[in-house]
Amino acid sequence: MRAFRLASGVLRNRKVILGIGAGSLITAGNIKIRNDSKFDAFFAKGFPDELQHRSLFSVLRSAFVYEICSRAWLVKLSLGAMSLCDVFHLSFLYNPFCRYTFYKHFCGGETPQAVMATMDTLQAAGITSCLNYSREVDLDGDMDVNKIASQGVVPPQVPVPSEKNQKVLRQIADKAFESNMHIIDMATYKPGTVCAVKLTPFINPLVLQRYNSILNQYPVESACNYLEHLKSPELSTYEVSELKKFWEYADKLCQFAKEKQIPLFIDAEQTYFQDCMHAVTVDLMRKYNKEVAIVHNTYQLYLKKSRKIMDDHIKKCVAEGWLMGAKLVRGAYLNSEPRFLIHDTKAETDKDFDSAVEAIIAAAAKFAPGDPASASDPIASRKGKWGIMVASHNKKTMFESVNLAETKKVDFTKTSFYLAQLLGMADDITYALAYSQRNQQPNFCIVKYVSCGPISEVLPYLVRRARENIDALDRCKEERAYYRQALRRRIF
């Protein structure tokens, strides 16, 4: 297997966190972790035991990371410092620091060997890996879709880029395709491993945005036909060519995943891409989810229309005879989306999310063909089953998901059920879930999203995660408390 190519850490218009000394790790005030109820007792188990088996250096590093992440002012200051370094092309000042702190904590490794070691560690704790090549691409000038989207302008037709820009786009697409193929191949190292893939590097983003605007004109019921709508007279010859190449890249990835029997979870995108992502993913599910759920779509329930879209896709899979694959999340682009598209309150988002989880579980129990022979070992077989992933760092969501499993509302002969968090985040949740299945036959998979690749390519991903979580200070403080207590136990 070919190793990832290491690259230099130049980062433009994207910043990651710089920090301060770790002197406050042990001496700061003690934040108690409550365990005075069934709910709190559930999450008090697992992670404290896990920390006891980690090296002192590993605990110190993680504690240092969370000391920074739990202070919004420090995160913002660090982002500013990174921006200043980038202006003067001084990224080498922060790259080594980031490699041995944030990258080590949040990412699986730069080489296949390092990623496999991470997979081994997780598997030993009863946790499945979801491998993810986490490169995020920024394009300059006329191809900067963020700039175009912020202006609210979609051109009547996307002009054919210069030969130079077309070459850049092809290089980006080919590199992303090659890296995702390696990730899928690497997933075969551990049985049960799954992959997450980001499809947007495969196409000129302006073409994707324009096709998204065309699909958005159709009712939900007819919008999710990616190949059918390529016949639209609104599309130019160049746009159709780009959209067909986009399909070819995605199709080849899914074909390879099917050959390797690796489930793929297609990443969600900003709303100016998302209708197109729904359409292409549904067409891929139609093709590849006949016997086993290989392709999984992502539904962001903080968007008002996502529940209706998910319900429509369920109806289609039942009517057309393919298996549903779904990942349910609240959402990842809250700070960059048009506000009117998002639920007015978090309570409304939570209500939509919880009802969507219950609805798709009930639909799987009713409509999925299933595999009755898998009753004694549900994880061993995915034949005839819907794939459902609940991805959240919300303790209440995870607790209720476990209750659904324990009260038999999840039919494990008809559902491959995944509960997922990001590597390095919400470890108290992940290890509590793993603890709940210790010493028994597991019915569902506990998953960590393992981002991997050269640090220079993964750094923008870390930056986006930092920005997304600036407002989630309570969660960071709660995780910080575990590391403080672990250090106190070892040192005092």
Swiss-Prot record:
Top-level taxonomy: Eukaryota, Fungi, Dikarya, Ascomycota, Taphrinomycotina
KW Cell cycle (keyword) present: no
Function according to Swiss-Prot or TrEMBL: Converts proline to delta-1-pyrroline-5-carboxylate.
Compartments it resides in: Mitochondrion
EC number(s) reported in the record: 1.5.5.2
Cofactor: FAD
Chief location bin: mitochondrion
Keywords: FAD, Flavoprotein, Mitochondrion, Oxidoreductase, Proline metabolism, Transit peptide
Top-level taxon in the UniProt lineage: Eukaryota
Disulfide-bond pairs as recorded: none
GO MF assignments: FAD binding; proline dehydrogenase activity
Family matches, as Pfam families: Pro_dh
Protein name: Probable proline dehydrogenase, mitochondrial
GO biological process, one term: proline catabolic process to glutamate
Protein family: Belongs to the proline oxidase family.
Any Gene Ontology CC annotation: mitochondrial matrix
Catalytic activity, reaction form: L-proline + a quinone = (S)-1-pyrroline-5-carboxylate + a quinol + H(+)
